[in-house]
Design a protein with these regions (language model features):
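Noncatalytic carbohydrate-binding groove/subsite architecture in carbohydrate-active enzymes
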Residues: 3-152
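Aromatic/acidic polysaccharide-binding cleft in carbohydrate-active enzymes
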Residues: 100-229
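Residue-level signal for functionally critical sites in structured catalytic/ligand-binding pockets
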Residues: 1-4, 8, 24, 58, ...
Length: 232
């Protein structure tokens, strides 16, 4: 809908009606508003979805690509809470996509390095790649973001993304490098690209530990600056 809420809401209402007409009422729920946000200012996407679409939305979600400084400072929690507050009672909200983009001035050196690495890589999209997936730092930052997502009251989170070969941008051989690996490394892009990247270990450990159906509790860490925690 390219930011047009009215157009999107009209499509949702039509699609919900078609599902119900096919006997799928109560069997298939719609997720929305699926908005990509950068700060708390876009929380109206959730509030308007709540007020104008009602039960046509079964599960709420947003996408976020925060800057490293936003997450590490804890500001990320406050941004997410603005959206959670707009979710109606009895409904849940999940993070439909999460990854890091160095969009804040404080992270300008990281962005410069990200662009340098992408330009030097023969198969990286220079417009849409996160080249720090090769660094352990990205794993700890993604864990930090997940903990804050939990603390903000979200019920699920999907990492962007599984495999580099899912998407390309400027050309078919210019991949959006964001994945845990590149499954076609050995065949096309170089055997080293199939190697599991460091952030996979952080994310997979959390997936195995924070099980579906768990109850989560806020954890206040004192005396250890920079350490984040969650209790389940």
């Amino acid at each position: 809908a390219d930011g047009d809420f009215d157009l999107w809401a009209k499509a949702v209402s039509y699609f919900r009606g078609r599902l119900d007409a096919e006997g799928l009422a109560g069997k298939v729920e719609l997720v929305g508003p699926d908005a990509a946000i950068w700060g708390p200012e876009e929380a109206w996407w959730v509030s308007r979805s709540r007020d104008e679409l009602g039960d046509r939305i079964g599960l709420y979600d947003i996408h976020t690509y925060p800057s490293k400084c936003t997450v590490n400072s804890g500001e990320y929690t406050r941004i997410l809470e603005a959206y959670r507050r707009e979710v109606p009672a009895g409904k849940k909200i999940v993070m439909g996509e999460i990854g890091f983009k160095f969009v804040e001035p404080a992270d300008s050196l990281l962005q410069a390095e990200n662009l340098r690495r992408a330009a030097a890589h023969p198969n990286a999209s220079t417009d849409d790649s996160q080249m720090f997936v090769y660094d352990p730092m990205y794993g700890t930052d993604m864990a930090d973001a997940l903990f804050q997502t939990i603390h903000a009251g979200y019920s699920g989170c999907i990492a962007w993304m599984l495999d580099d070969t899912m998407h390309f941008k400027e050309a078919p051989d210019k991949l959006k490098i964001w994945g845990f690996w590149n499954i076609f490394g050995d065949e096309i892009f170089g055997a080293g690209e199939e190697r599991v990247r460091p952030w996979y270990y952080a994310w997979s450990l959390l997936c195995r530990t924070l099980r579906p159906g768990s109850d989560f509790f806020a954890a206040d860490v004192r005396g250890a600056a920079g350490v984040k925690a969650v209790a389940a």
